[in-house]
Structure formats: structure tokens, C-alpha cells
Amino acid sequence: MNSLFASTARGLEELLKTELEGLGATDCQVVQGGVHFQGDTRLLYQSLMWSRLASRIMLPLGECRVYSDLDLYLGVQAIPWTEMFNPGATFAVHFSGLNDEIRNSQYGALKVKDAIVDSFTRKNLPRPNVDRESPDLRINVWLNKETAHISLDLSGEGLHLRGYRDGTGMAPIKENLAAAIVMRSGWVPGTPLLDPMCGSGTLLIEAAMLATDRAPGLHRGHWGFGGWAQHDDAIWKEVKAEAQTRARQGLAAYESRFYGSDVDARVIERARRNARRAGIGELIDFDVKDVAQLNNPLPKGPYGTVISNPPYGERLESEPALIALHSLLGRIMKSQFGGWNLSVFSASPELLSCLQLRADKQFKAKNGPLDCVQKNYHLAESEGGKPAMLAEDFANRLRKNLKKFEKWARQEGIECYRLYDADLPEYNVAIDRYADWVVVQEYAPPKTVDAHKARQRLFDIIAATIAVLDMAPNKLVLKTRERQKGKNQYQKMAEKGDFIEVQEYNARLWVNLTDYLDTGLFLDHRIARRMLGQMSKGKDFLNLFSYTGSASVHAGLGGARSTTTVDMSRTYLEWAERNLRLNGLTGRAHRLMQADVLGWLRESTEQFDLIFIDPPTFSNSKRMEDAFDVQRDHIRLMTDLKRLLRKGGTIMFSNNKRGFRMDHDGLAALGLKAQEISQKTLSQDFARNRQIHNCWLITAA
């Protein structure tokens, strides 16, 4: 009997134990990452040929204590290597694990290689050559603390490499994990199996091989026992011949079908090639189809199983499309696949909840470094018609707001407006529309809120928003924002450079929904900008802390004699120039100046009839001479502004500080007075948030 070890992906150990016992293995002991077992020579070869779950089959050769590199060398050399190698066999060493003495796996592998080679040269035998790519023997050494475990890897390459796959689509799963997913799915061979996002077909191919009794090792061309002196070629040929016979018989007897579809035609063609190479191509119907086009291929029965490993993104921007995809899949399952079973494997439990189905069973497994879950569902026969929507109370409020604001915005001639502003406290997001795009902004929840629940609620919001607005998921932009402090307000998020053109009254403006936390257009200032346009005819207009210059555009379109746009950011000034140019406002009459606004104010001697200033609440930018606090410093600001204001001129002063208190006495000392117009500048879509900004008209007293 041989003592053997089968490694596998984390989470599959018990399943592998059951499989090995079915092959005839004895004394199976589960450990993390694999199973120790006993078996004769035939069982050794059968485990290599037939295990669908094992990553590798190892023959342990010995172990040694390692307190120095010499201990490792001597421990390896104690193994009778000359009795293990066929003459002329090549080998490679795979070394994993580190300790205080062996701190580099390459160094460890080199010591093992030296010990093996020296075992031959000391007996005056030809030294074996190393072949890292395709060796006849693979030596595996695992250093765990002070103990090195030395094994012969009889698999050669990993057993997941069945020999049928020439390439993969994005984010593949290994074949042995795919086999485990099939085994755990609840699917019964002989019944239909459908994968609506099949990629290169791995799940369906593994299922078809299982159903037709086709050994997973049948198509492999290289093994790890070719140079092993104890290899019994006669028994190996018997095992292989038996597998070939069973595969022929299994294929001939199998009557059910498999169905696979994917939106990518190139991936589907690859799946067809893979299935043909695996010998079961005639059993699988592959089709180029989006999930939205999915239908039941057997509406009159029999019932089957839908199995899938849908995409799951790790980038925030991919989530809206993935949420919509899972929500859509759930609706289609309920409406078209009543009586079927569904099994979905994913690294995102939150996305699975968008299916709106209750799982009967669930399993955990690792896909490489990712913690994954597989959930099985039964779709009741009565489930049909229109399913309930996620976050129904939120969806109802959004519908109500849409009905109200859509008509109003059309009448006003605006394409950008707020649809939802944390109307329901438990759905704490803002939803803004920019033409046919939508931005969902979630404030980062407090630490007291469970992160998983907060993320789940956000997913519900996105799914409901896409459904209510009947919009393309790729036109929804998701942003999570913390309460902004100073310069963080304008932090860079990405480098896409995607601008879209929108209308605001008679102005055309560029917005960018992805590259920055803000979009280039503060929607709550819309009415203030229109007022500036109405006040600007024949006047010299100054726009300070100008951001992307939208106020300058309105002033220019309102007939201003000149506009001067000042901001410290070159990026935003270039954006402002694009906005002005889009509206035909070019030439010397429309100046753009990059400067520290506070420093520029102190030094400028120019005069203006109308000044708009919307300073940050607080700023301590390195490029500004002093830290700025709008509450503390607004009178100092007005002192400089008064010097630039022509007789009879007006300052529109706005800021976003909640609880801002105007220093009327300080203004009076300057000979100025302030009229608050905050409520006049608040449009319908911001009526719920009356403190979003405060706005003042300041003139001579």
C-alpha cells in the first residue's frame, strides 16, 4: 500500500475525501488543503485518472527537521534518489514555505536540487538534468515551520489541466473547482443543465464529462511519473484502457442535453472548441446570447438546473452593471424557469442577494485568493409574472419624484437635477440626473452601521434605480463620498476623461461624471447662475473660486461686457475654457486666470460691476498663502471685494457652511449691507435640503 496525499482548493476537502473513497481509497484523513489516504498501485493511477477535484496527487517520500540549510540538504539526501529515477530522467523542484533559516524559496529549491544531484555524483552515476518546463519527475518540498515535507508529485502539471482548454474568457475558474461547483449544484445527470454566462464552457464541459463517465485525465498528455523507477506501465495502460471504454459507452448512452450562452461570440467559439476537444461537443448547444435574451429551452419540461459563475467586479464602477445583471437574472429565473433549480457561484454574497431568491443550501470555497460562496435555489412552479422589487418603499418614492421632477425639468429647460435626496433616512443617498446618465452618491456610513448591511442596501438602491428609471446600467455612476474637508472636495478619482454635454436653461455645459468626486456642475446653484445671467447685461463680471466656470457662461450669455474667471486649478480653468467655448464665448472679453484667489484679491486693482464668489468652507491648500475659514474670514474677504466693486455694483456671495452667520455689523463697518436670498436660489429638487447652501446679495449700504 502507498501513503498518498491529494491536494485541493480550500473548502473542497470533504468533497474530495468522498470522491477518493468512491475510488477505493482507505484511511482517508482530511487536513487543510487536501486529504491523506492509502491505496495500492492501481488506486494511485485511478486517483490520477479519475479525480475531478484533486489539484495534485503526491507520494510522500520523507520529512526532516530544518534548523539550517545544511539540515535541509542532508535531510533531502537521505532519500534514495538513485532508486527513484529512471536513467536519463529530468527533474524539477517546487519549494514552498519559509522559516527563520530558509527565507527564500528559490534558495530552498537550489539546496534540494544540489542534494539530489549530489546523491548521483557520489555514486559515480550520471547527474540528472533539471527541466523546469516539462520534467519527467517533479519533487515537491513544503517547509512548515521547522519541518520539510518531501514528496514526489505524480501529477506533473496540476490535475485541473485536463487538456481540453486552449484559452479562457475573463476571470476563469479552474476545472477542478468547476467540477466541485457542478457536484454541489444539486444537478442530477440525465436532466438538462443550462449556463447563461458560460464563458469558455468549463462548468458545462465538466458536467458533461461527469455525466458521460469520461475520466478527467483521459486527454492529458503529460504526467509526473514518466521518469519514476517504480512506475508500473502495465497497470497504467489498464487504467487508461478502462477509462477509454467507459467514456465511449457513457457518451453513447447519454440522452439529455446541455445549454450554454454568452454575450461574447469569440468566447462561445472557444467554448465549442473546448467541448469538442473534451469529446462531448455533440451534447452541448452553445449560443451567443445576452442574459436579457435568455429563455427556457424546454418550456414544456423536463425540469433541469441553471448553473452559473457570473462576473463579480472589484472596482466600484463595475457594480451598477453587475447589480443590474443579477437582478435581471433573478427576474428571468422566476418568470421562465419555475420548477427548475438554480446554483450560483460568486465572490460577492451581496450580489447574490440581488437575485431576490431564498437559498436552500450554500457552500463555501476558495477561487484562488477569493473567498466564494455557492448558493442553491429551487424555483417554485408558481413563481411567474412580475416579481416584487428590491427596496419597494425606496422605489415608490423614486417613482413619485420622477413623475414630479421630470415634467418640471422639461418645462424649465434643464437636463441636470436631483431626483432623490435622502428622502427616506434608511436609504441615505443622493441621486442626480445628467441627461440620460444618473449619479448615485452614497455618504460613507458611520462606523456604527454594519458594513455588510450598508453595502447590501446600496445594492438594493442601485437595482431599484435602474429598474424605475428603465435605464442602461452602464449609464449609472456610483460614488461613495465622505463628508468633505477642504481640498478633499475636489479629489481625483480616475483618469477616464469622459465628458458629456448637458443643457441648463440656455447654456450648454460639459460635465464629467467619473473622474472627480464632483461632476463639474453644482446643481444646487442652478438658480443663482440664472440670476447672475439676468443681472449681467452690459456689466464686467468677476467669478472667483470659479470651479468649471458655469457661472461665467451664464453671465456671458446674459450679455456681460466681460467675464473674468479665477481659480487656482489649471484643470478646472481648462474645463471652464471648454464651457465658454461651447457657448461661443471666446476672445479677450472672456479671461481665465490661474491664481490663489485670496492672494489675487489682495493685489488686484481692477473694477467690476458684478462679482460672484463661492469660496470653500475651509481650505488649507499648500498653494494658498493662508488657511481659510469662511465663517472666520468672510469680513476680511468682503474688505478686499469692496475695493474691486464699482459704485452701484453687487456681490453675490454663497457658501456651503451649515449654520453660517453673516456678520452684519462687520459689513456695516465697511459700508456694505447683505440681503439673504438662500430660499430664492433653492429650486424644487433641493427643497428637502434647505441648508445645502446659503446665498447673499451684498451692496453698498
Swiss-Prot record:
Main enzyme class: transferase
Keywords, sorted A to Z: Cytoplasm, Methyltransferase, RNA-binding, rRNA processing, S-adenosyl-L-methionine, Transferase
Reaction(s) catalysed (UniProt annotation): guanosine(2445) in 23S rRNA + S-adenosyl-L-methionine = N(2)-methylguanosine(2445) in 23S rRNA + S-adenosyl-L-homocysteine + H(+); guanosine(2069) in 23S rRNA + S-adenosyl-L-methionine = N(2)-methylguanosine(2069) in 23S rRNA + S-adenosyl-L-homocysteine + H(+)
Family annotation (Pfam families): Methyltrans_SAM, RlmL_1st, THUMP, UPF0020
EC number, UniProt record: 2.1.1.173, 2.1.1.264
GO cellular component: cytoplasm
SMART domains cross-referenced by the UniProt entry: THUMP (SM00981)
Subcellular location: Cytoplasm
NCBIfam families (alphabetical): PRK11783.1 (NF008748)
Name used for this protein in its record: Ribosomal RNA large subunit methyltransferase K/L
Organism of derivation: Klebsiella pneumoniae subsp. pneumoniae (strain ATCC 700721 / MGH 78578)
